[in-house]
Amino acid sequence: MAWIENDEGDVLLVRQTAGRKLWTLPGGKVKRSESLQRALKREIQEETGLRVAAVRYRQMYDRPKRGAITVLFAVSVKRNPTRTYFPTQEIADLGFFDRLPTNATPSAKFFWKAEYPGKHLNPPG
């Protein structure tokens, strides 16, 4: 998963078209014989149209009950992230958030709390 901030420090989240349509950090599955960083770059390009400039490991979220490990990378992109976006087959919407929406994935909640312990977890009321 990618932690991408804009100039204001807001974090990029995507809302998927399939499943429960929850907000999450950009990212996806690693293909056979693909490195973690290559998979991350491919997924970010596919989901957001942004091109990755640099990737730095941040932390890991182990989910043994699901048999999954999710890895978080801090990502900088080749151009400043903007709010201009066109939906894709996988992604219904995206946006930069200063608060984590209540309808977010467990992994997004885990990483948000770890990366932004002082930031709000819910939209303003």
Regions found by a protein language model. Name each.
Residues 5, 58-59:
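Conserved positions in beta-strands of structured domains
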Residues 7-9, 18-19, 65-66:
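Short strand-connecting beta-turns/loops that link adjacent beta-strands
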Residues 17, 61-65, 88-89:
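A short beta-turn/loop motif at secondary-structure boundaries
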Residues 20-23, 88-125:
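Nudix hydrolase/Nudix homology domain
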Residues 61-83, 95-99, 109-116:
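Active-site-adjacent beta-strand/loop module that shapes the phosphate/pyrophosphate-binding cleft
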